[in-house]
């Protein structure tokens, strides 16, 4: 049999097991929490790592647990050659209120596995595991150092993979399997900054609430003139914090502060901050508020900025600080994460893209996205799958997607991801040999 015939045989032989194991992993509610387990991200994230560890050992793969932050997986010990890391994660975001199905039941409905994290990123994790296990099962030698890494804190800062890379070192190339095929050749930069100003006398408190895994908070509660109000996320109110602070009522003590802050809230491209920018590869700067806090004197708003790949993120930080000095607002930089960009002509990016297009008779192009994945932590890397960019899921509006209600992964898209990862691993290994 040739390679593709072996892949088809492998998928046919293991299809029920692949679905069953994916369902089993989905049943673990691996949401990052602080508990008394002694594990860095809580007992459930640790259980997910243990599950993956056991499954890998059943497949005769070699594993190393990096203190329950990451699990490293290889075909054999003492691998040599260039190093490829394929990174996925077992942690998930918290559930939402409007699920139709139990988010941690891990059940199949029609052609879909439904449950929290099955798209982001447990399905892709299982796909990468079975892709590497294919080489072990069929005795196909890999000449280079091919590793999987399963993380536990991708959704809350990615310090898990940082911890791993500090100890294991950077690979020659890294792949993040955390979006759609064919290839993600860049991610926008990220800056979080806060603005504080004295609150108006009639404002007792304004605070927003949400999980640390979800960017924009789900609720904004305020007490003004003794009257309590809670604004929640609805179809019409996408951002409760923005809705609260763009109403008719003045919330800040000084008229000038109110004016400046309303300008920022209304300026989604960052013009008033001096950071508006556009490039053909990644689009334009985006700015949005996502959190509100208050104390006895001040209101603090925290904003998320996504920057095009050609905009120097250090310049963005400098301009934010300069804006604070110019306006008298208290500006603090909360978080900075540099994006990345690989030219579409990069030999691995182009090879993987062509591989996908050939396999599916498509004409897809590499793309840049605003979301953050493990790919940005590699000195050299990109995203590679594992979703279908044209899939239309048979669920109600707002259901079926990553981070949403009733997250759902098509079983055949999952099998396609395994096939593409096998082909991708083999192509990179051959190229490096």
Positions of PLM-derived features:
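Zn-dependent metallopeptidase/amidohydrolase metal-coordination segment
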Residues: 10, 295, 353-357, 362-431
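Generic non-transmembrane alpha-helical segments
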Residues: 10-17, 21-28, 51-59, 134, ...
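Acidic/His- and Gly-rich active-site-bordering loop/insert found
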Residues: 2-113, 142
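Midchain, well-structured core segments that form catalytic/ion-binding scaffolds
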Residues: 155, 161-314
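Active-site metal-coordination/substrate-binding segment of hydrolases
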Residues: 57, 62, 81-150, 397-400, ...
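Buried hydrophobic packing segments
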Residues: 125-135, 164, 224, 378, ...
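A short beta-alpha structural unit
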Residues: 249-250, 288-293, 302-309, 330-349, ...
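Acidic, glycine-rich active-site loops and adjacent beta-strand->loop/helix elements
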Residues: 90-92, 146-158, 177-182, 388
């Amino acid at each position: 049999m040739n390679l593709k015939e072996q892949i088809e045989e492998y998928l046919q032989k293991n299809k029920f097991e692949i679905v069953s194991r994916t369902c089993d992993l989905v049943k673990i509610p691996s949401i990052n929490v602080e508990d008394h387990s002694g594990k860095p991200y809580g007992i459930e994230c640790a259980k997910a790592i243990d599950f993956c560890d056991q499954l890998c050992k059943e497949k005769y793969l070699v594993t190393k647990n990096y203190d329950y932050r990451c699990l490293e997986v290889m075909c054999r010990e003492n691998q040599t050659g260039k190093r490829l890391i394929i990174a996925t994660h077992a942690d998930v975001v918290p559930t939402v209120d409007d699920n139709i199905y139990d988010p941690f039941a891990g059940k199949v409905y029609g052609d879909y596995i439904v449950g929290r994290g099955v798209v982001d990123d447990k399905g892709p994790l299982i796909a990468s595991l079975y892709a590497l296990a294919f080489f072990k099962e069929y005795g196909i030698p890999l000449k280079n150092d091919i590793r999987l890494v399963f993380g536990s804190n991708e959704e809350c800062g990615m310090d898990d993979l940082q911890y791993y890379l500090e100890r294991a070192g950077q690979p020659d190339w890294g792949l993040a399997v955390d979006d759609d095929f064919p290839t993600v050749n860049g991610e926008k930069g990220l800056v979080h900054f806060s603005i504080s100003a004295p609150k108006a006398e009639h404002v007792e408190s304004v605070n927003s609430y949400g999980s640390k895994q979800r960017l924009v908070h789900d609720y904004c509660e305020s007490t003004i003139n003794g009257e309590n109000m809670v604004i929640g996320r609805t179809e019409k109110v996408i951002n409760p914090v923005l809705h609260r602070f763009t109403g008719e009522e003045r919330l800040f003590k000084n008229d000038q502060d109110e004016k400046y802050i309303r300008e920022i809230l209304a300026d989604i491209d960052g013009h008033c901050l001096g950071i508006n920018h556009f490039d053909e590869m990644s689009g334009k700067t985006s700015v949005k508020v996502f959190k509100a806090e208050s104390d006895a004197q001040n209101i603090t708003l925290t904003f998320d900025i996504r920057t095009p790949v050609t905009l120097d993120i250090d310049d963005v930080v400098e301009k934010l600080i300069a804006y604070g000095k110019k306006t008298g607002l208290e500006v603090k930089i909360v978080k900075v994460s540099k994006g990345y960009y690989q030219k579409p002509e990069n030999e691995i990016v182009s090879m993987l893209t062509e591989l996908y297009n050939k396999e599916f008779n498509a004409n897809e192009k590499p793309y840049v996205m605003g979301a953050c994945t493990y790919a940005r932590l590699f000195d050299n890397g990109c995203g590679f799958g594992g979703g279908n960019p044209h899939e239309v899921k048979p669920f109600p509006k707002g259901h079926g997607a990553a981070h949403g209600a009733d997250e759902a992964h098509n079983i055949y898209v999952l099998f396609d991801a395994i096939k593409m990862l096998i082909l991708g691993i083999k192509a990179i290994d051959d190229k490096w040999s």
